[in-house]
Amino acid sequence: MLAGDLKFINETIGIQGFSSTYCCPYCLKKKPWTGPHAELRTLGHIRKHAREFKEKLDSGEKEWRDAPEFFSSVNQPLYDEPDWTFILWLIPIPELHLLIGIINKICDVLNFRWSKLSGIKDRFYKWADKKAKLQRQSYRDKSFNGPTCKKLLDKKLRLLRRALPYCLRDFLLLFNSIDRIRHACFGQKLFPSYKNEIENFGNLWSAFKIDITPKVHVLLDHVPVFCAHHNKGLGYFNEQVLLKTKHFSFHLLIHLLI
């Protein structure tokens, strides 16, 4: 197994980034991520469609905009495992990147709705900066990093509750829900409640009428399957793969430089 953030994963398996139609590294579900679970990606599926895409591209029959016809598979994966290998078993789900992405999405939506209600631009982020001492990182497109996301969940929700207008306090349900998921299956141990916690989060997300992002899709569709298969929390795997990742990253660097 190897590890990386979702952008890194997509690059190494040969599919397009998260603005593409079929951008999930683990399955063939397309935006807007509605409906039942989709077929899981395999290395063989990506290899086949990337090869066909290149042939059509070279012959002039297809253009880059036609990549969705090939499930956004545009390059050969940088892995040697057999064709039948599922990406979900090959590359563990990066729990920290899920947490960061989902927390920042909740914050963005809360900021928009609070700003609209109050008439004050960036109302939530001004509260976070001045009252909660939670600073966004400019190098991360003005988003909270991992430690700041955890600080918000661990230490600042009571303070936020006091600051929020009553009609927006339901956002605390979302923050508390992702926090329960973090404790249930994002660490090295897996707790029995993880499936219910993820299902409850999905119901809340739907009730808030927030668009499903790639990271929310991965959480809802793939984290329960991965954890049930291995009977361990996500953190266990991302601890185990560090040495292998160092070895792989060296070969990836050589590949990218050539």
Predicted features by range, described:
Residues 1-258:
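A structural signal for the principal folded core domain
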